[in-house]
Curated annotation (Swiss-Prot):
Primary residence: cytoplasm
Listed name of the protein: Argininosuccinate lyase
Subcellular location(s) of the protein: Cytoplasm
Keyword Lyase belongs to the record: yes
Catalytic activities: 2-(N(omega)-L-arginino)succinate = fumarate + L-arginine
PROSITE patterns named among the record's database cross-references: FUMARATE_LYASES (PS00163)
Keyword terms: Amino-acid biosynthesis, Arginine biosynthesis, Cytoplasm, Lyase
One function term, GO molecular function aspect: argininosuccinate lyase activity
Annotated family: Belongs to the lyase 1 family. Argininosuccinate lyase subfamily.
Pfam families: ASL_C2 (PF14698), Lyase_1 (PF00206)
Biological pathway: Amino-acid biosynthesis; L-arginine biosynthesis; L-arginine from L-ornithine and carbamoyl phosphate: step 3/3
Cell cycle as UniProt keyword: no
GO cellular component: cytosol
Length: 476
């Protein structure tokens, strides 16, 4: 029978009802075709629950053995693709329980003792999300390693730094990349912190008020690797703040990715020409033969809006719910699942596009190509060393505001002449202020500008190398 066909079997809860659920309602309320991805967490939670029930003598040893045997077969069936997911059984939980009962009889019916789907699904999602958090942490580290790798090879490459997208001051290209490393490092800290709140066990809270059975919740928590148990049964089954928190974290990651992707798109354009991307990360045009479009970066930028939307959806989902569980919470899974998939895929492909493919031995191939000469030409065109001239005058004794005004006049005249400040003759510069001497030209070079910013966190090459070493030691 097709997984989309309905049979006449009643739901696990249907004994009270005098008429069957309409097929439209079945389709509208079923979640199995998206929540079946929780099957491993569901089986793990059920096995831990069954072991605890047996240890507490709530079910017998033979019941436990039968449940374990049945779950092993169900695992094999799901992994092989032979398991039949049935829409009329609503969700992953009842599909697995129904198959278990079919395989082992009454032992399968005893599994749900002391448990509700309310605490079961909350446990499944937390258990699943914990694994995805750990996988995402690895990808975040890989993203940082890719950026550090490119930075380590481009410490002395000079990029025009921008404010308001206008040339501001020269910076090391490596320094620019390391700014994103810092952002992703904070994201990683947020992820590690939220994991502590995700890793709490709801199971044993039952529908909302706890249970009359002598459950050992701490035992189940230890078996499943949770740090502890949720302390209030109403809260445990009804809140999804952990899903909101993860999606909030993911939103920040995607915003950071989006900013970086925007710069990659700009840098690759002919008007900038600062970098090139491998053909494998670009697409062409169906009408314009010359086009090489940075679609990966553009999609990463676009997908940030998708994740922001999921965050807004989850917040809106929770804002009006009274305690305790409500069916609204079924709507938490699709945005959470898609957020996880989007963040993981985006981090993986962006790290590879920037830093190259990583071989088994740790070597890298590919990655973005840096056009150092184009970056330097752009910095020279934008009077990026104007602040350096002002600083030079301050060191000669002028108040900064006076120095600022002097340099503004010099820049205005240089623009009229079509020259950079460093190209103006000494005599011309001395006409703006008599304290200027021949050493001024050293201050007006791009390299001199970088070297002068030798403060902690600054763009001087010595500082940038120290930053790279710090990140390399941290990331391993």
């Amino acid at each position: 029978m097709s997984t989309n066909q309905l049979d006449t079997k009643s739901q696990a809860w249907s004994a009270l009802f005098s008429e069957p659920m309409s097929e439209l309602v079945k389709r509208y309320t079923a979640s199995v075709f998206f929540d079946k991805r929780l099957w491993q967490a569901d089986i793990a939670g059920s096995l831990a629950h069954a072991e605890m029930l047996a240890a507490q003598q709530i079910i017998g040893a033979q019941d436990l053995a039968d449940i374990q045997r049945g779950m092993a077969q169900i695992t094999q069936e799901i992994e092989s693709g032979a398991f039949e997911w049935k829409l009329e059984l609503e969700d992953v939980h009842l599909n697995i329980e129904a198959r278990l009962t079919q395989l082992v009889g009454d032992a399968g019916k005893r599994l749900h003792t002391g448990r509700s789907r309310n605490d079961q699904v909350a446990t499944d999602v937390r258990l699943w999300l914990r694994g995805e958090i750990d996988a995402t942490a690895v990808l975040l580290a890989d993203m940082q390693r890719a950026l550090v790798h490119v930075a380590s090879n481009n410490v002395d490459v000079i990029l025009p730094g921008f404010t308001h997208l206008q040339v501001a001051q020269p910076v090391s290209f490596a320094h620019h990349l390391l700014a994103y490393v810092e952002m992703f490092a904070r994201d990683a800290e947020r992820l590690a912190d939220l994991r502590k709140r995700v890793n709490r066990l709801p199971l044993g809270s039952a529908a909302l008020a706890g249970t009359s059975y002598p459950l050992d919740r701490e035992r189940v928590a230890r078996t499943l690797g949770f740090d502890g148990v949720c302390q209030n049964s109403l809260d445990a089954v009804s809140d999804r703040d952990f899903a909101i928190e993860f999606t909030g974290f993911a939103t920040l990651v995607m915003i950071h990715v989006s900013r970086m992707a925007e710069e990659i798109v700009l840098w690759m354009s002919q008007n900038f020409g600062f970098i090139n991307l491998s053909d494998r990360y670009c697409t062409g045009s169906s009408i314009m033969p010359q086009k090489r479009n940075p679609d990966v970066a553009e999609l990463a930028r676009g997908k940030s809006g998708r994740v922001v939307g999921h965050l807004m959806g989850l917040i809106t989902l929770m804002k009006g719910q009274p305690l305790a569980y409500n069916k609204d919470n079924q709507e938490d899974k699709e945005p959470l699942f898609d957020t996880v998939d989007t963040v993981k895929d985006t981090l993986r492909i962006m790290a590879e596009m920037i830093g190259g493919e990583v071989a088994a031995d740790g070597s890298r191939s590919g990655g973005l190509t840096v056009k150092a000469e184009a970056m330097e030409r752009a910095a020279l065109r934008g009077y990026a060393t104007a602040t350096d001239l002002a600083d030079y005058l301050v060191k000669k004794g002028l108040p900064f505001r006076d120095a600022h005004e002097v340099v503004a006049h010099a820049v205005k005249d240089a623009i009229a002449l079509g020259k950079d400040l460093s190209e103006l003759p000494l005599e011309t510069l001395q006409g703006y202020n008599a304290t200027i001497t021949a050493d001024v030209h050293a201050a007006l070079t791009l390299a001199g500008s970088l070297n002068a910013r030798n403060t902690l966190g600054g763009t001087a090459p010595s500082q940038v190398r120290a930053q790279i070493e710090r990140h390399q030691a941290r990331l391993g």
